[in-house]
Amino acid sequence: MAAIELIDLKKNYGPVPAVKGINLTVADGEMIVLVGPSGCGKSTLLRMIAGLEVISSGHLRISGNDVGHVDPADRNIAMVFQNYALYPHMTVRQNLEYGLKNRRVPRHEINRRIADAADILEIGEFLERRPRQLSGGQRQRVAMGRAIVRDPAAFLFDEPLSNLDAKLRVRMRVEIRRLQRQLKTTSLYVTHDQLEAMTLADRLVVMNGGRIEQIGTPVEVYRRPETVFVAGFIGSPPMNLIDLDELGPSDRAFPRDTDLVGIRPGAINLGAGSAHDLRFDAHVELIETVGDENNVHLRIDDSRKRIIASVPTDRHLRESDRISCHVRMEALHPFNKSTGRRTDRSR
């Protein structure tokens, strides 16, 4: 196991900056998830740590050693890819032992590591099969097994579940989290799927445009997004972002420079509320039933701003209904559009 430090890490492709001065410390045994939209730099950053991309500037330290210019094979890191990267002509056992044989690990040690990995991942019955004889989930477990047998200082996961169907992704998320906790190996995991990120991470690193927008536990990032981007990216349905002048009056003042308000769909309550609440009237345009909740698409009166409210299905609404809504002031997220940041920084 090892701590990983990224110090002002940058990556340029010619004149184009892709990763813009990343500073991050991953504690020994921690699971960090890098999450963000396509093109935000998260996979490039992971490949820089792995040594598959040359670092333009900055420092990368693993266990206190600067490894920015060390060959990938000598960084003691194991990577799990989206496409499994298994040799199709080899059996599962041969795939697991291939890297160890190249490193001249003794045969008895190879056998021990394969047996341990097969036991942890429950792939013992597949050892003599070839990848084409396995399901997608089984192939991904073999790919993780190949990483485990290396006994690395850290795991790097590059969107490993993207090729799996929704049901299998849920199961594999649980397996990866269980495995990481069991092995206590420092891990960095890249995904664009926020649900995957929220369920796996000890801490989230939300990226956008090659920069870090926010670092925090999943609960911290969800409850208190620090930027407009994070507010709109984390959460499903996403947070409603509304210009302050599009909302009705309230007897409570917002922090200075607030001109944009974020409201989680679940924070919108039906009914008039009290004078202390933020209140507005709206028309129901569309109702989506999602399990025990309805995502109700609303158009705020006068402003014509469209928002989403999540309400229980036992609240009987019809499209074209006109309803009153209220939000507790404590549930509002105040932002400034120019800076893109919260205005209640001291709270």
Curated annotation (Swiss-Prot):
InterPro entries: AAA+_ATPase, ABC_transporter-like_ATP-bd, ABC_transporter-like_CS, ABC_transpr_MalK-like, ABC_transpr_MalK/UgpC-like, Mo/tungstate-bd_C_term_dom, NA-bd_OB-fold, P-loop_NTPase. It is a peripheral membrane protein. Pfam families: ABC_tran, TOBE_2. Residues 4-234 form the ABC transporter domain. GO terms for biological process: carbohydrate transport; glycerophosphodiester transmembrane transport. The keyword Transcription does not apply. Its main location: membrane. It catalyses: sn-glycerol 3-phosphate(out) + ATP + H2O = sn-glycerol 3-phosphate(in) + ADP + phosphate + H(+). Its EC number is 7.6.2.10. ATP binds at residues 36-43. Keywords: ATP-binding, Cell inner membrane, Cell membrane, Membrane, Nucleotide-binding, Sugar transport, Translocase, Transport. It is found in: Cell inner membrane. It comes from the Bacteria. It is an enzyme of class 7 (translocase). GO terms for molecular function: ABC-type glycerol-3-phosphate transporter activity; ATP binding; ATP hydrolysis activity. CDD domains: ABC_MalK_N. Disulfide bonds: none annotated. One of its GO terms (cellular component) is ATP-binding cassette (ABC) transporter complex, substrate-binding subunit-containing. The complex is composed of two ATP-binding proteins (UgpC), two transmembrane proteins (UgpA and UgpE) and a solute-binding protein (UgpB). Belongs to the ABC transporter superfamily. sn-glycerol-3-phosphate importer (TC 3.A.1.1.3) family. Part of the ABC transporter complex UgpBAEC involved in sn-glycerol-3-phosphate (G3P) import. Responsible for energy coupling to the transport system. This is sn-glycerol-3-phosphate import ATP-binding protein UgpC 1. It comes from Rhizobium etli (strain ATCC 51251 / DSM 11541 / JCM 21823 / NBRC 15573 / CFN 42).
